[in-house]
Structures are given as structure tokens and as C-alpha cells.
UniProtKB/Swiss-Prot annotation:
PROSITE patterns: B5, FDX_ACB, TRBD. Residues 39-148 form the tRNA-binding domain. Binds 2 magnesium ions per tetramer. This is Phenylalanine--tRNA ligase beta subunit. Mg(2+) binds at D454, D460, E463, E464. GO terms for biological process: phenylalanyl-tRNA aminoacylation. It is found in: Cytoplasm. GO terms for cellular component: phenylalanine-tRNA ligase complex. The gene is pheT. InterPro entries: aa-tRNA-synth_II/BPL/LPL (IPR045864), B3/B4_tRNA-bd (IPR005146), DNA-bd_dom_put_sf (IPR009061), Fdx_antiC-bd (IPR005121), Fdx_antiC-bd_sf (IPR036690), NA-bd_OB-fold (IPR012340), Phe-tRNA-ligase_IIc_bsu (IPR045060), Phe-tRNA-ligase_IIc_bsu_bact (IPR004532). Residues 701-794 form the FDX-ACB domain. Its cofactor is Mg(2+).
Length: 795
């Protein structure tokens, strides 16, 4: 919103300069976006009168004038403006004057005729872009007066950003109220003398939508001169607020809008058939707007109609068929309170955003309509003449907004502000804000003023008291609290440490939605019931996730569709599993999951182009598990999972309890999700891993290690992990390392069997092992494998 600083100072004039005023307004919560002078920098321009005006003898478009500027003689000035005429009061730049752009006025000859100055237009003085003619001043403008003084051009336009909750500041009166409160000054409102009815003319008014229009005032004014010029003082105030003068009737309604914040509209009374009906539009009803466009109305749009047709969109835009024109003699002034909910969104639906809709959407003072009607009537009659009829008031008290009664407690005020403000000061602030205040013991009862819709709860009053008291006046006090060192168990494994490891391995962390597409989730977890949202964002986001895989796989598809074929991502977050034994019937588990697909390495001339496989992901997962210190207790077991490839997946067990899965996505699921190529996933229940085993210091043997290799033939269904585990168990203290380095199937090995080549590392911490001891330990391992797995040594 833009307004003139001088106009504001007519209401309240604090003894501070423009910069301090702008800062004060900003600190009050109305952010000042800019302060600009209303005119360019110039001097030497005075009010003059054109005494004579004749045609230039040598130029058809020029005139030779004699101008009285209050000196001892008339000035000869050549002028090319089409509106220059005898008797006109004008702005005269005399010799020696300097206009904007450092343009100096000198004596000159134009087409042979002397010119001792210049008759100025608004654009030449940097006041506006209007360069259609010279400035026409009122006939009573005092000759010789400095034009800056006469037009009050030592003024600024202040532009503020008004937040949606402060609709009361969409008029000069609202800003003035705040400035008056902040400076503890009285508000000087212009005297609004009621205009008594001098005629009996009225129009019948019916309000069929009282919820949308709780109050509607109408008044007939007859015999106006719509062609009467708008006074220069009003034009200037409108211009400085960014509004162009149109005609006297429209200018008056715009003036009241800017001054009081109350939108108004004027209908041509003679074009209204029957009377006024305030109703909701009929489905498909049309209205030709003032700009000539046709709007197709919806049934939820409020309209002002006569007995035959819609005349205007209520609170938004007028209609062409009832608008004021050059032939208008009788008008109906409308001043109403429309409910914000009945206006919100309707203007945007038709590509409109008007000053009226901007205010009605945020809320207009429901007690303002009488004052605005009297103000507009007085201005209209003073400018255009005419006679006013009685004010017709249709009010539905039941649907008018009620003023909120709020209790402010001393304890709440002190706690939220952190500073004690004296009781009498709090009372004074609330009363200056317009509240009706009743003091109690350690509390205040405040009835909010009608113009403050945003005062509804106790915190609103706390904010107002702090704002008016001044945030800068509240002392800075450091927070004081006892500092207690938190206990930290060495066994606690931070999830951040795991994320860092995965980052180092080339994974990127992602965060996906907790609500997913139930159809996709059923593909991954067929037959498992999920928690459905009663009011989802969309059908595709209507179920709470049972695992992190749903979001991660969708992220892979998203990236593959954008030519990102090598993907390595992970996520930590909650899954939501229905469980009748859990609180509220839902169990929330913290999970860690990851996905890889594409090439094993980034593209490089010296690296083979190989696709990731099961063992790539299993290796990364083992690195994570190694951080827990429990890797030796983890087992990977072949176990079916409907989302995973039956031959390339495993369940992950810790001390006999399943804690997750790892494997290749099932080919059928891969096809349904449009995954491009082999995709591998893992998921772990993090809470079952977070309690790590603290590493224990062990003595490093100074004696040589010995390696012995054996190859055993076992049945195809015997897991290699069980073979390695048995060797570790049998070897006790001497076997310090067991590793599978080859798997063979083929010639020499019966069908249904496989050959596992295993290396045994033997070492003692106190002595060098003898060959006989080594051989005995190896034999013991072989014997144990024969007994448990029916293994045989391969020749």
C-alpha cells in the first residue's frame, strides 16, 4: 500500500523526520518497502496567471502569452501546450529556475518571439508521467506563490507491506492509529458531518445472502454533475497513493477507500430496474464487467443485482450496464460489509485482483459503513452537487462479526515477553489500541476494537503490548540454565557415523515421504495390511510405508528416467506397521535401507564396466555391520521375500533374530516398477544394532602365522558361512582367520555338490606353532566338517 506522508501527518504528526517515521512504522510490524519524494528536485517555479494568449505568428502549434507572476511586469512566454488559454492559473518556471535533470531556464527566442520562462506540465516537474498539457491550477491559486509550497510537494510517498492479519492498515486511518499509539499522540480524524436527507428518493434493497453480506447500506444522490472536475488536492492525494484520477464520482469512492479502508461503489440509479438484490449468482449467469470482459459466474459468487440482472460482483468489480458514465445524473452509493469467506478466491477465479477484493478478503471494519457513507456523500455533493436521500440500512446482526473478549494474564505476559511491564502501562497500551479494558487481579479483560480482526487470543494481546512497548525497549537477557554434562555410553553407535561410512562409499542420503502409493506398496509387501490415511494429499500418497524400499525404489525410477543410471542411495526413517499390541495400534520402527544399481564404478578409462551384483551390496552392508562389533554374530540365511530374487537374496540374523533383508529386486517387481536393470536393496532394523560391542584391546602375536588351504566337497544346499563358522569354532584360539577363496562346480565334483576352497590362518600369541600342532588342528577341522556336513576332502 502507498500513501502520502503529509496525508498521514494530517491525522497524526509526530515530531520525527521521515526516516525515523519509516523506521517506526517498520518496527510496528508494517514493513516499509520504500520512501520516495512525490516530485523531482526543482526550484524557481511559481503560480502564474495567463493574462493574454495569442497565436504565434510563425508557428501553428505555438502560442504567445503574457503571464502575471506577481512581479512589476507581465512575462512574455511562448507555450506549445494545447490547453493553454487566457485566465488559466499555471505553474511558471521563471528565468533562473532549475528543473529536474539540472535543466536551467534562460531567456530565449522561439521562432522569433521572446520567451522569459516556461509554463510547466506535471512531467516536467517530475511529479507524474502526464505530459499532455500544462498544469491547470484552481482559479483561486495565489499568484506568485512557490509551486512547491502551494502543491505541498515537499512530501514523500511511503510504500508498506501490509500482512494479511493487518487489514485495518489498508487505509490511512489504520496506519495513523498505529503511529498515534506508538508516539502517545491523539488521533486527529477529519470531521465528518452527517448529510441530512433533502429528498425522499430511495431504492428497495433486499439481502438474500445475509451470511455473505451481513450489512448493506444504500443511498440515492440525485442531480449530480458527473463532469465536475475533481479538486486538485484530491487528485494529488490519489496520485501519491498510486491511483489515477478518473472522474469525480470514482475519485470520491477511491478517496474514501484510501482514507478509511472502506470499499464503495456508485451505480447509475437510472439503469437499475426495480431495486437492489444482494444474492448468490445463478449457475452459468454472466456479467459484463466495467472493463468490457464477460465473466461467467459460479453459484458461490456473491452478486449485486436488480430485479432482472446482475449488476456487479459483490466486493470485487462493477458491471458495465450499471456503471457511472458521462450522462449519469443520479447515483446509488453502495457501502457494505461482505464476509471475507464469501469474497476469498472469487476474484482470482476470473483473473482479477482489485483494491476492493484485496480489502474484503482480509476483512473490513463492520462498524465503518455509516461513517464511510456520510464521508462519501459529503465529498460527492461538495464536488458534484446534488441532493441526498435517506440512508437505507439492511443489517443482519446475527451474522456480523462479534468483537472478541480476551483475558490477558500477568503470568502469561511476563513469561512470553521475558520482561515486566508495569500494570498501568499495560492498561494504557491496550486502551490506546482501542480496546475496552477492565482491570482485574493480575489480569486484564480486553474487548478488541471492531477494526482488529487479528485480536482473538491471549497471545495476540501479548504481541500488541510488546509491539507498542517497543521491542528495542525489552532488555537483552542471556539465558541462564544449569549445564549438566549428558551421559554418553561408549556402546551407543551413532547413526551419523553409519551415514558417514555410506557417504564415503559413494552413497547419497535421501529423504522420501512416509506416505506412499498403496498399490506399489502391495507389490513389495503383498498381503500385508498398511495404515491408510483418512485425508490423503492424493490417492498415490494414501498409505503409511511398511518399509523404506517403496520410496527408495521410486527415487531410483525417477533418477533413471533422467539418465542417471548409476544410483547409490540410502535413507533412515520410520516404518509404520499395524500392531494390536502397540500403543494406538501402530508400531514405529527406525529403519536403515539402501539401494544400488548400474555400474560398479564411475566411468573411467582404467576401470572395467561391470554391473553391481549381490556381493557388492553385501560387502557394503558388512562394513556397516562391522561398526557394531557384531559382524561375527551376524548370519546371512537363504529366506524367501516376495520383493527379492529367490536365488540372490538373504535374510540377516543377529543372535538368531531376524534384523533385515538384502538382495536383488525380484524380476517381476522390477518389471512392474519400470526399473532399468538389476537393482539391489537392503534394509535393517536399526534399533537392534545401535548398541554396539565395544572393541577390546588384544595382544598382537609376535610369532609367525601359518596358512593351510583345504578344499572340501559338500552338498549344494550347505551354506559356505556355516562351513567357515564351524572351522572358527573348532580352531578355538589357534585359528585366527578363515576365508573362502574359491567355489568350484564341474568336472571331478558330483552333480548336486560343490567344492569350497578355504584358507586357515593359524597363529599363537605365546610361541611358534610346530608343524605337528598345525596338522592336528587342520585335521580336527576336517573331521568336524565331515561329521556335521558329510564333507569330504577334495583330491
Amino acid at each position: 500500500m502507498k500513501f502520502s506522508e503529509l496525508w498521514l501527518r494530517e491525522w497524526v504528526n509526530p515530531a520525527i523526520d521521515s526516516d525515523a517515521l519509516a523506521n517506526q512504522i517498520t518496527m510496528a510490524g508494517l514493513e516499509v518497502d520504500g520512501v520516495e519524494p512525490v516530485a523531482g528536485s526543482f526550484h524557481g517555479v511559481v503560480v502564474g496567471e495567463v493574462v493574454e494568449c495569442a497565436q504565434h505568428p510563425n508557428a501553428d502549434k505555438l502560442r504567445v502569452t503574457k503571464v502575471n507572476v506577481g512581479g512589476d511586469r507581465l512575462l512574455d512566454i511562448v507555450c506549445g501546450a494545447p490547453n493553454c488559454r487566457q485566465g488559466l492559473r499555471v505553474a511558471v518556471a521563471t528565468i533562473g529556475a532549475v528543473l529536474p535533470g539540472d535543466f536551467k531556464i534562460k531567456a530565449a527566442k522561439l521562432r522569433g518571439e521572446p520567451s522569459e520562462g516556461m509554463l510547466c506540465s506535471f512531467s516536467e516537474l517530475g511529479i507524474s508521467d502526464d505530459h499532455n498539457g500544462i498544469i491547470e491550477l484552481p482559479a483561486d491559486a495565489p499568484i506568485g506563490t512557490d509551486i512547491r509550497e502551494y502543491l505541498k510537494l515537499d512530501d514523500n510517498t511511503i510504500e508498506i507491506s501490509v500482512t494479511p492479519n493487518r487489514a485495518d492498515c489498508l487505509g490511512i486511518i489504520g496506519v495513523a492509529r498505529d503511529v498515534a499509539v506508538l508516539n502517545q499522540l491523539p488521533l486527529v480524524e477529519p470531521e465528518i458531518v452527517p448529510v441530512g436527507a433533502t429528498i425522499d428518493d430511495t431504492l428497495p434493497i433486499t439481502v438474500e445472502a445475509p451470511e455473505a453480506c451481513p450489512r448493506y447500506l444504500g443511498r440515492v444522490v440525485k442531480g449530480i454533475n458527473v463532469k465536475a472536475p475533481t479538486p486538485l488536492w484530491m487528485k494529488e492525494k490519489l496520485r501519491r497513493c498510486g491511483i489515477r484520477s478518473i472522474d469525480a464520482v470514482v475519485d470520491v469512492t477511491n478517496y474514501v477507500l484510501l482514507e478509511l479502508g472502506q470499499p464503495m461503489h456508485a451505480f447509475d440509479k437510472d439503469r437499475i430496474e426495480g431495486g437492489i438484490v444482494v444474492r448468490m449468482a445463478k449457475e452459468g449467469e454472466t456479467l459484463v464487467l466495467l472493463d468490457g470482459t464477460e465473466a461467467k459466474l459460479n453459484a458461490d459468487t456473491l452478486v449485486i443485482a436488480d430485479h432482472n440482472k446482475a449488476l456487479a460482483m459483490g466486493g470485487i468489480f462493477g458491471g458495465e450496464h450499471s456503471g457511472v458514465n458521462d450522462e449519469t445524473q443520479n447515483v446509488l452509493l453502495e457501502c457494505a460489509f461482505f464476509s471475507p469467506l464469501s469474497i476469498t478466491g472469487r476474484a482470482r477465479r476470473h483473473g482479477l485482483h482489485t483494491d476492493a477484493s484485496h480489502r474484503y478478503e482480509r476483512g473490513v471494519d463492520p462498524a465503518l459503513q455509516y461513517k464511510a457513507m456520510e464521508r462519501a456523500t459529503r465529498l460527492l455533493i461538495d464536488i458534484c452537487g446534488g441532493e441526498a436521500g435517506p440512508v437505507i440500512d439492511i443489517t443482519n446482526e446475527a451474522t456480523l462479526p462479534k468483537r472478541a473478549t480476551i483475558t490477558l494474564r500477568r503470568s502469561k505476559l511476563d513469561r512470553l515477553i521475558g520482561h515486566h511491564i508495569a500494570d498501568e502501562q499495560v492498561t494504557d497500551i491496550l486502551r490506546r489500541l482501542g480496546c475496552e479494558v477492565t482491570e482485574g487481579k493480575d489480569e486484564w479483560q480486553a474487548v478488541a476494537p471492531s477494526w482488529r480482526f487479528d485480536m482473538e487470543i491471549e497471545e495476540d494481546l501479548v504481541e500488541e503490548v510488546a509491539r507498542v512497548y517497543g521491542y528495542n525497549n525489552i532488555p537483552d537477557e542471556p539465558v541462564q540454565a544449569s549445564l549438566i554434562m549428558g551421559t554418553h555410553r561408549e556402546a551407543d553407535l551413532s547413526l551419523k557415523r553409519v551415514k558417514t561410512l555410506l557417504n564415503d562409499k559413494g552413497y547419497q542420503e535421501v529423504i522420501t515421504y512416509s506416505f506412499v502409493d498403496p498399490k506399489v506398496q502391495q507389490m513389495i509387501h503383498p498381503g500385508v495390511e498398511a495404515l491408510l490415511l483418512p485425508s490423503p494429499i492424493s490417492v498415490e500418497m494414501s498409505a503409511m510405508r511398511l518399509s523404506l524400499w517403496t520410496g527408495l525404489l521410486a527415487t531410483v525410477v525417477y533418477n533413471q528416467n533422467r539418465q542417471q543410471n548409476r544410483v547409490r542411495i540410502f535413507e533412515s526413517g520410520l516404518r509404520f506397521v499395524p500392531d494390536t499390541q502397540a500403543p494406538l495400534g501402530i508400531r514405529q520402527d527406525l529403519m536403515l535401507a539402501g539401494v544400488i544399481c548400474g555400474n560398479r564404478y564411475e566411468e573411467h578409462w582404467n576401470l572395467a564396466k561391470e554391473t553391481v551384483d549381490f556381493y557388492d551390496l553385501k560387502g557394503d552392508l558388512e562394513s556397516v555391520l562391522d561398526l557394531t562389533g557384531k559382524l561375527n554374530e551376524v548370519e546371512f540365511r537363504a529366506e524367501a521375500n516376495p520383493a527379492l530374487h529367490p536365488g540372490q537374496s538373504a535374510a540377516i540374523y543377529l543372535k538368531g533374530e531376524r534384523i533385515g533383508f538384502v538382495g536383488v529386486v525380484h524380476p517381476e517387481l522390477e518389471r512392474k516398477l519400470d526399473l532399468n536393470g538389476r537393482t539391489l536393496v537392503f534394509e535393517l532394523e536399526w534399533n537392534k544394532l545401535a548398541d554396539r560391542v565395544v572393541p577390546q584391546a588384544r595382544e598382537i602375536s609376535r610369532f609367525p602365522a601359518n596358512r593351510r588351504d583345504i578344499a572340501v566337497v559338500v552338498a549344494e544346499n550347505v551354506p559356505a558361512a556355516d562351513i567357515l563358522s564351524e572351522c572358527k569354532k573348532v580352531g578355538v584360539n589357534q585359528v585366527v582367520g578363515v576365508n573362502l577363496f574359491d567355489v568350484y562346480r564341474g568336472k571331478g565334483v558330483a552333480e548336486g555338490y560343490k567344492s569350497l576352497a578355504i584358507s586357515l590362518i593359524l597363529q599363537d600369541t605365546s610361541r611358534t606353532l610346530e608343524e605337528e600342532e598345525i596338522a592336528a588342528t587342520v585335521a580336527k577341522c576336517v573331521e568336524a566338517l565331515k561329521e556335521r556336513f558329510q564333507a569330504s576332502l577334495r583330491d
